Regions:
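Bacterial Sec-dependent N-terminal signal peptides
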Residues: 1-15
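Carbohydrate-active catalytic/glycan-binding domains of CAZyme proteins
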Residues: 12-216
């Protein structure tokens, strides 16, 4: 595509693991027009702890061969972010032809970026966090689920799980932030919400540390 020329795309052959030349984590897949868009976090290799400044994108049409599109967004995408670390686990969803990237900035809440293309460029429509509970650092690992009736929800949090009802514009919400009264046993972080055959499922990073995968 034209975007590949600008981003200097690289072809990545299918191997295990898929990504071998960069330190990536928190893969967030989205299927759109028969293509898997895999958004990831990116950890630099010159620090002992987390040093995460941007988000990357990989795509595949066969789940075997992958194209590296490089950096799709970064902390610099948010003018209100003054730190150079903390680009944690993101997720991108599509609605009405637009693509919304929900980005936690560790210690600064959750921001949202919008694009007309899943390849970007992603821009900040708010100029401020979508969610920021300043009394703690729980606001990480957002996931967005759109139910069959069109209502969108955003879930997030560590060690508690919260949610809000997103408005149709996907960049604002109605009502209060709700903390789940009964957090699933061993819930730690990284919620993902699904619906199948009339049942709702919450998958999450479980226990710590190391973490496993749990569901409820």
């Amino acid at each position: 595509t034209g975007g590949c020329g600008l981003l200097n795309c690289l072809n990545v052959n299918a191997q295990r693991p898929i990504i071998q030349t960069k330190y990536t984590a928190d893969p967030a897949p989205m299927v759109y027009n028969d293509t898997v868009f895999l958004y990831t976090t990116h950890d630099e290799d010159d620090a002992e702890g987390f040093k995460m400044q941007d988000w990357l994108l990989y795509t595949s049409t066969d789940m075997v061969n992958w194209t590296d599109h490089g950096v799709v967004a970064s902390l610099k995408s948010f003018d209100w972010v003054k730190r150079d670390n903390g680009a944690w686990a993101e997720q991108v969803v599509e609605r009405n032809g637009k693509f919304y990237m929900y980005c936690p900035i560790h210690g600064n809440g959750i921001g949202v970026l919008v694009s007309d293309s899943p390849y970007g460029p992603f821009k900040d429509p708010l100029g401020k966090p979508l969610v920021w509970q300043k009394e703690h650092w729980d606001d990480i690992d957002p996931t967005v689920f759109i139910d069959e009736d069109g209502q969108a929800y955003m879930y997030w949090g560590n060690p508690n799980c919260y949610y809000v009802k997103l408005n149709e514009d996907m960049i604002s919400y109605s009502g209060d932030i709700v903390k789940l009264k009964e957090t699933p046993e061993h819930y730690q972080e990284g919620p993902w919400f699904y619906k199948r055959n009339g049942h709702y499922y919450l998958a999450f990073a479980s226990t710590c540390c190391p973490e496993g995968i749990g569901y409820a």
